[in-house]
């Protein structure tokens, strides 16, 4: 595996803040599963995200609250089937979003996991 050198002006380790992690994952989840953007939700305001993080609310619970409040319908599920599928997201959806957005790396796995689960100690 070849590693790339750090360019001048580029941070050696640019770790996103908890709010940025939520924004990245919310954008992915809302777009992929509900066809929405971050600006379509109260999470367009960083303060709302900060309040959720400080309150220890998980990302999954925050999204599912929006789904229930606004009766959102998942757009990523194929038509009707014999079994009714839930409109809510789950931990697998969040893991897939983390992988798709590059937030599944070994060096930040635990930190991102704690942030998405509402267990980020620095927020309290």
From Swiss-Prot:
Main subcellular location of this protein, as a coarse class: cytoplasm
Induction conditions: Expressed in mid-log phase at lower levels than toxin relE.
Top-rank taxon: Bacteria
Keyword Disulfide bond in annotation: no
GO biological process, one term: regulation of cell shape
Disruption phenotype: No visible phenotype. Deletion of 3 type IV toxin genes (cbtA, ykfI, ypfJ) leads to a slight reduction in resistance to oxidative stress, has no effect on cell growth.
Location of this chain's protein in the cell: Cytoplasm
Region feature Required for interaction with MreB, mapped onto this chain: 74-124
Record's keyword annotation contains Cytoplasm: yes
GO cellular component: cytoplasm
Sufficient for toxicity, toxin less stabile, as annotated region: 1-73
MF-aspect GO terms: cytoskeletal protein binding
InterPro entries xref list: CbtA_toxin
Keywords: Cell shape, Cytoplasm, Toxin-antitoxin system
Pfam families: CbtA_toxin (PF06755)
Subunit-structure text: Interacts with FtsZ. Interacts with MreB.
The family this protein is said to belong to: Belongs to the CbtA/YkfI/YpjF toxin family.
Task of the protein: Toxic component of a type IV toxin-antitoxin (TA) system. Acts as a dual toxin inhibitor that blocks cell division and cell elongation in genetically separable interactions with FtsZ and MreB. Interacts with cytoskeletal proteins FtsZ and MreB; inhibits FtsZ GTP-dependent polymerization and GTPase activity as well as MreB ATP-dependent polymerization. Binds to both the N- and C-terminus of FtsZ, likely blocking its polymerization and localization, leading to blockage of cell division.
Miscellaneous comment as given in the Swiss-Prot or TrEMBL entry: Encoded in prophage CP4-44.
Domain notes: The N-terminal 15 residues are required for interaction with both FtsZ and MreB, while the C-terminal 63 residues are required for interaction with MreB.
Name by which UniProt lists this protein: Cytoskeleton-binding toxin CbtA
Organism name: Escherichia coli (strain K12)
UniProt gene name: cbtA
